[in-house]
């Protein structure tokens, strides 16, 4: 079976699952990338072990969004003659690929990291496009329960939907024997931009220090436009909070950084999932997360391995105080993080994509 996936660009949390898919007997996987890297992405990538094509980059920027318009996807598809076409978005390039599949009677699969909540504000036109594509697609792949809810909202039967979770290499983040006490109380990992609320994380550290009546330490991993403002605040409140800024970290540097802290703060205003939560859980950290992350109430379960809280500083600080002052509670939450994240693996993700492809191919034979 020749499977062609058309997607924006290579991302570290999907490549290992695609490598596994490509290694399956009887499977030829070819991934068509719209670009080598979107301008706001700074991650490093694991080895790519599948065939791929990089289209000539044609990117339109609208605010923080990047729109891909690559007509050369059509000759690439004609050359590959796929048995199944998967698209992971609704940029013009993805729609060209969908049109190819429909016109050539090739089964089409919709794959999304999006959620019901992340798409609630879409325009009527965007919804109409989705209805058109969904009505002519054979199978659907979701990354989170929010994605499952999204497909259900369009009336798509559960039997046509398959899970391909977002994940990391869990074993890389596991605690090493003989590890010392983590020097940081908190870690914030991600782009230091307003949508991620890094300043809120500092406010939580400050309020927690007041509750514990001691100085707390927070580590920022990442970079962005908000860093200077937080550094200025940290200088003013140095008696209560010690803030350290690591800057951008490569994938290989991340595990010890997570293990250097006790609690992961994830106060995002918008994240369809949030792979940083996988990384934190794999390192055994309890997670405080806003309800605006797709991982909330799925990977991070309120009261089990963390807390899902609205963006209220004192509410977050109260929960942080509980974890930092109750060793038994902390240990239980830490162990539960390790347990929950075991269900999020690259093998599981690969199996979900393969199941969707088999379902789509079976429909073609009918």
Predicted segments, located by residue:
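Conserved donor-binding/catalytic core segment of Leloir-type glycosyltransferases
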Residues: 4, 178-206, 219
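A short, histidine- and acid-enriched strand-loop-helix "catalytic/donor-clamping" loop
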Residues: 106-124, 136-139
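Nucleotide-activated donor-binding/catalytic signature segment of Leloir-type glycosyltransferases, i.e.
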Residues: 231-249
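Short hydrophobic beta-strand element within catalytic cores of glycosyltransferases
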Residues: 286-290, 300
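Conserved acidic donor-binding segment of nucleotide-sugar-dependent glycosyltransferases
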Residues: 301-314, 322-327
């Amino acid at each position: 079976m020749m499977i062609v996936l058309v997607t924006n660009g290579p991302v570290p949390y999907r490549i290992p699952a695609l490598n596994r898919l490509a290694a399956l007997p009887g499977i030829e996987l070819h991934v068509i990338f719209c670009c080598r890297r979107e301008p706001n992405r700074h991650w490093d990538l694991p080895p790519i072990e599948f065939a791929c094509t990089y289209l000539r980059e044609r990117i339109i920027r609208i605010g923080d969004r990047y729109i891909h318009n690559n007509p050369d996807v059509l000759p690439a598809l004609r050359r590959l003659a796929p048995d199944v076409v998967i698209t992971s978005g609704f940029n013009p390039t993805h729609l060209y690929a969908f049109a190819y599949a429909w016109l050539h009677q090739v089964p089409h699969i919709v794959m999304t990291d999006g959620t019901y909540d992340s798409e609630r504000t879409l325009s009527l036109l965007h919804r109409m496009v989705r209805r058109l594509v969904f009505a002519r697609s054979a199978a659907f792949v979701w990354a989170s329960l929010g994605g499952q809810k999204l497909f259900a909202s369009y009336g798509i039967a559960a039997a046509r939907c398959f899970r391909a979770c977002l994940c990391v290499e869990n074993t890389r983040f596991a605690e090493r024997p003989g590890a010392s006490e983590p020097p940081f109380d908190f870690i914030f990992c991600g782009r230091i931009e307003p949508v991620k609320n890094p300043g809120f994380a500092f406010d939580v550290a400050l309020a927690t220090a007041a509750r514990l009546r001691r100085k707390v330490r927070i580590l920022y991993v990442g970079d962005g436009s908000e860093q200077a403002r937080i550094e200025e605040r940290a200088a003013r409140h140095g008696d209560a909070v010690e803030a350290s800024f690591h800057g951008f970290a490569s994938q290989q540097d991340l595990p010890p950084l997570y293990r250097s802290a006790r609690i992961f703060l994830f106060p995002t205003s918008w994240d369809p999932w949030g792979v940083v939560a996988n990384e934190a859980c794999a390192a055994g950290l309890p997670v405080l997360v806003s309800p605006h992350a797709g991982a909330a109430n799925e990977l991070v379960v309120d009261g089990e391995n963390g807390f899902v809280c609205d963006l209220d500083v004192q509410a977050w600080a109260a929960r942080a105080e509980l974890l930092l002052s109750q060793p038994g509670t902390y240990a239980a939450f830490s162990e539960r993080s390790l347990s929950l994240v075991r269900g999020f693996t690259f093998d599981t993700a690969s199996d979900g994509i393969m199941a969707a492809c088999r379902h789509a191919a079976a429909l073609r034979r009918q």
